[in-house]
């Protein structure tokens, strides 16, 4: 069971990265909370890993901190929440914000996340409220990144949000409200788009 990987960041996208560990490339799925903190491609990187084993596949999920990993594992421990949905939940809320929503029973905020209905939100609060109080969560730190072209940024954000469960037309509308500046990054535009979508 893989629990930690350390190597060189060979490729990154909002959905997954490829981590080069001594010449072997590992594809690791990540939430936005981890993506925001990644170094530039070629940089050194160490990720906490959760290994998901199924009959037909072995998937790796990576996190910059042990706390994020623990939160992910708490989420998938809730009935009806698999690794993909748990990653989506973390992608829509920073760990500290998610913890606050669970502790305070903010069902409206939780239900606004794609893939989570009212019943799932209620189940999350019921099962995780007390556990969240015991789990200290730090704000993710911003990581360095280069500034790609505006259209490339929009395309990456569009793809990432569609993969999270948002309708393309809804995402396009949100992106239309944003002004992508010359120094904009995928991380920044993702955060801004999510704020609009979560209204």
Swiss-Prot record:
Residues 144-148 are annotated as: Flexible linker. Residues 1-64 are annotated as: Domain I. Residues 65-143 are annotated as: Domain II. This is Holliday junction branch migration complex subunit RuvA. Residues 149-199 are annotated as: Domain III. Homotetramer. Forms an RuvA(8)-RuvB(12)-Holliday junction (HJ) complex. HJ DNA is sandwiched between 2 RuvA tetramers; dsDNA enters through RuvA and exits via RuvB. An RuvB hexamer assembles on each DNA strand where it exits the tetramer. Each RuvB hexamer is contacted by two RuvA subunits (via domain III) on 2 adjacent RuvB subunits; this complex drives branch migration. In the full resolvosome a probable DNA-RuvA(4)-RuvB(12)-RuvC(2) complex forms which resolves the HJ. Has three domains with a flexible linker between the domains II and III and assumes an 'L' shape. Domain III is highly mobile and contacts RuvB. The RuvA-RuvB-RuvC complex processes Holliday junction (HJ) DNA during genetic recombination and DNA repair, while the RuvA-RuvB complex plays an important role in the rescue of blocked DNA replication forks via replication fork reversal (RFR). RuvA specifically binds to HJ cruciform DNA, conferring on it an open structure. The RuvB hexamer acts as an ATP-dependent pump, pulling dsDNA into and through the RuvAB complex. HJ branch migration allows RuvC to scan DNA until it finds its consensus sequence, where it cleaves and resolves the cruciform DNA. Gene3D superfamilies: 5' to 3' exonuclease, C-terminal subdomain (1.10.150.20), DNA helicase RuvA subunit, C-terminal domain (1.10.8.10), Nucleic acid-binding proteins (2.40.50.140). It comes from Citrifermentans bemidjiense (strain ATCC BAA-1014 / DSM 16622 / JCM 12645 / Bem). One of its GO terms (biological process) is DNA repair. Keywords: Cytoplasm, DNA damage, DNA recombination, DNA repair, DNA-binding. GO terms for molecular function: ATP binding; four-way junction DNA binding; four-way junction helicase activity. Belongs to the RuvA family. InterPro entries: DNA_helicase_Holl-junc_RuvA_I, Hlx-hairpin-Hlx_DNA-bd_motif, NA-bd_OB-fold, RuvA, RuvA_2-like, RuvA_C, RuvA_C_sf. Pfam families: HHH_5, RuvA_C, RuvA_N. GO terms for cellular component: cytoplasm; Holliday junction helicase complex; Holliday junction resolvase complex. It is found in: Cytoplasm. It comes from the Bacteria.
């Amino acid at each position: 069971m893989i629990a930690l990987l350390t190597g060189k960041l060979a490729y990154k996208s909002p959905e997954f990265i490829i981590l080069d560990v001594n010449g072997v490339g590992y594809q690791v799925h990540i939430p936005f909370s981890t993506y925001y903190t990644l170094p530039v491609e070629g940089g050194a990187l160490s990720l906490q890993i959760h290994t998901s084993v199924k009959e037909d596949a072995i998937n790796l999920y990576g996190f910059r901190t042990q706390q994020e990993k623990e939160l992910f594992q708490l989420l998938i421990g809730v009935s009806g929440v698999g690794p993909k949905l748990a990653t989506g939940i973390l992608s829509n809320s920073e760990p500290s914000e998610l913890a606050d929503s669970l502790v305070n029973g903010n069902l409206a905020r939780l239900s606004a996340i794609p893939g989570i209905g009212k019943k799932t939100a209620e189940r999350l609060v019921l099962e995780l409220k007390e556990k969240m109080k015991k789990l200290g969560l730090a704000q993710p730190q911003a990581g360095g990144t280069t500034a790609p072209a505006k259209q490339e940024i929009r395309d990456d954000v569009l793809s990432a949000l569609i993969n999270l469960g948002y309708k393309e037309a809804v995402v396009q509308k949100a992106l239309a409200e944003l002004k992508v500046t010359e120094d904009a990054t995928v991380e920044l535009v993702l955060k801004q788009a999510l704020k609009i979508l979560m209204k």
